[in-house]
Amino acid sequence: MSGYDRALSIFSPDGHIFQVEYALEAVKRGTCAVGVKGKNCVVLGCERRSTLKLQDTRITPSKVSKIDSHVVLSFSGLNADSRILIEKARVEAQSHRLTLEDPVTVEYLTRYVAGVQQRYTQSGGVRPFGVSTLIAGFDPRDDEPKLYQTEPSGIYSSWSAQTIGRNSKTVREFLEKNYDRKEPPATVEECVKLTVRSLLEVVQTGAKNIEITVVKPDSDIVALSSEEINQYVTQIEQEKQEQQEQDKKKKSNH
């Protein structure tokens, strides 16, 4: 058994490539990331690891990276692995602009990132990337939001709302209950609020460990400040309390 465990390009007798499956386990241990498509925006939200007391917070890397002026990428899994993927994706986006004089489409970039991940499952002397990504943005001259996911195996898929990383099952169940594909969040505020609510299902420490980036058409990408995120968290907690009080009243009336 151990031989199949170690060798990357060998299938086990029952058809598994264990190293790729272990890479997925690394993703499940990574901090949670969520992507939600609104009517005219895409929001990426991430759980940030707590910084230590003496750590310089300015160079704590963001979990959301800009690949081009209209595409952002968030990840879950090994930070160092993600840096390589992000760098490769940026270079590809730049060379596409230079060669074709046109920005990449979001799907093209997703396919490229998934292709890099796939190559690292089939080569000797390398290991798979321990990273899943969420890639969000708008195509040039198009107002339709796009959200894709890639996995260590090289699979990529398109989503209305998706989550990766630890506790992603809990967050996905929340999104399945609260996200309506026929009527996605109509405003940026609604979309951000749903993203923050989904993250609060698993992030215990509130606003200080949440990161939110909003992508709108025409290369309009904004990272929300801690104060803005805090306002959303406070509002959500107030609504929760009001709901609990209403439920209590209903019970006591019965």
Curated annotation (Swiss-Prot):
Pfam families: Proteasome, Proteasome_A_N. Its main location: cytoplasm. GO terms for cellular component: mitochondrion; nuclear outer membrane-endoplasmic reticulum membrane network; nucleus; proteasome complex; proteasome core complex, alpha-subunit complex; proteasome storage granule. SUPFAM superfamilies: N-terminal nucleophile aminohydrolases (Ntn hydrolases) (SSF56235). Keywords: Cytoplasm, Nucleus, Phosphoprotein, Proteasome. One of its GO terms (biological process) is proteasome-mediated ubiquitin-dependent protein catabolic process. It comes from the Eukaryota. CDD domains: proteasome_alpha_type_7. Residues 235-254 are annotated as: Disordered. It is found in: Cytoplasm; Nucleus. The modification Phosphothreonine is found at T60. The keyword NADP does not apply. Residues 237-248 have a biased composition (Basic and acidic residues). Present with 16800 molecules/cell in log phase SD medium. The 26S proteasome consists of a 20S proteasome core and two 19S regulatory subunits. The 20S proteasome core is composed of 28 subunits that are arranged in four stacked rings, resulting in a barrel-shaped structure. The two end rings are each formed by seven alpha subunits, and the two central rings are each formed by seven beta subunits. The catalytic chamber with the active sites is on the inside of the barrel. Interacts with CIC1. Belongs to the peptidase T1A family. The proteasome degrades poly-ubiquitinated proteins in the cytoplasm and in the nucleus. It is essential for the regulated turnover of proteins and for the removal of misfolded proteins. The proteasome is a multicatalytic proteinase complex that is characterized by its ability to cleave peptides with Arg, Phe, Tyr, Leu, and Glu adjacent to the leaving group at neutral or slightly basic pH. It has an ATP-dependent proteolytic activity. This is Proteasome subunit alpha type-4. It comes from Saccharomyces cerevisiae (strain ATCC 204508 / S288c) (Baker's yeast). The lineage of its organism: Eukaryota, Fungi, Dikarya, Ascomycota, Saccharomycotina.
